[in-house]
Amino acid sequence: MMTEKALPESLTCRISSGFFLSPALHVFNPDTDYALGDGGRFYTPPRIVSRMRRELALFPATYATPGDMILLLDDISRDEMENSPYLAVMEAKRIKAVPLAGLQGLAHSVRSIAPWGWNATLLRILEENNAPATLLPSPERIAGLRELSHRRTTVAFHRLAPTIMPQCASPVPVELTSEDEVMDFCNRNPGCWLKAPWSSSGRGVMHTDDLEERHIRPWARGIIRRQGSVMGEVDRGRKLDFATEWM
């Protein structure tokens, strides 16, 4: 019987109760929030986001398990790979980078596909490159994940928080579905915040302090046309800006 000591170092962490665990296939797609906002299967991200996806393609190596793989959504040259700040950790963990063209050959080699975030465009790309259907979520699952990512989800949290921690009571966000509703909310709550249902990196957020109606209406009109609504939040005089990533 093969013992753990007889295995290559990169595989020893994959022994659990006597079973070998196949590697996970990671995908870095930081454009996922934009793609969720678009909702379609043929979304093209802004150039700056596409560049970030390309430059940080090996970033999953920082949290991947030794022996895992990374799927490259872009054609990355050898020089780009060698200049990546994550190459060293990738080599230390013996993580393999796989181009899209090599996806079909992984049908029996990986246990899961783990993107930065699922969306309809990524699902189409993986399907077109013959990813194993058993590793892909259904279109219905993608639609469900998109709804969970909508900012209206925070309404339930705002209502629940005070029942658990009374000191955390705060004004509940309001979903606004027309320009007139947006302006009425702004007039009743000077200096309020307006937020697109789906956005990323601070984009899609407007602080209305010192802004006139002629600035607010066009912005709200565009968001409502593309995403169906705008979320309104009362300004609370913030003390600190921060964000968290859940892995």
What is each model feature region?
Residues 7-62:
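N-terminal-proximal low-complexity accessory segments that begin disordered
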Residues 24-26, 113, 192-194, 230:
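Generic beta-sheet signal
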Residues 26-39, 74-75, 117-120, 197:
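Short loop/turn segments at strand-loop or loop-helix junctions that form parts
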Residues 34-35, 78-81, 200-203, 239-241:
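Flexible loop/turn segments at secondary-structure boundaries
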Residues 49-63, 71-184, 200:
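Conserved N-proximal alpha/beta basic substrate-recognition cap immediately N-terminal to
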Residues 172-173, 191-216, 243:
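Glycine-rich phosphate-binding loop of ATP-grasp-fold ATP-dependent ligases
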Residues 190, 213-247:
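Phosphate-binding site of ATP-dependent enzymes
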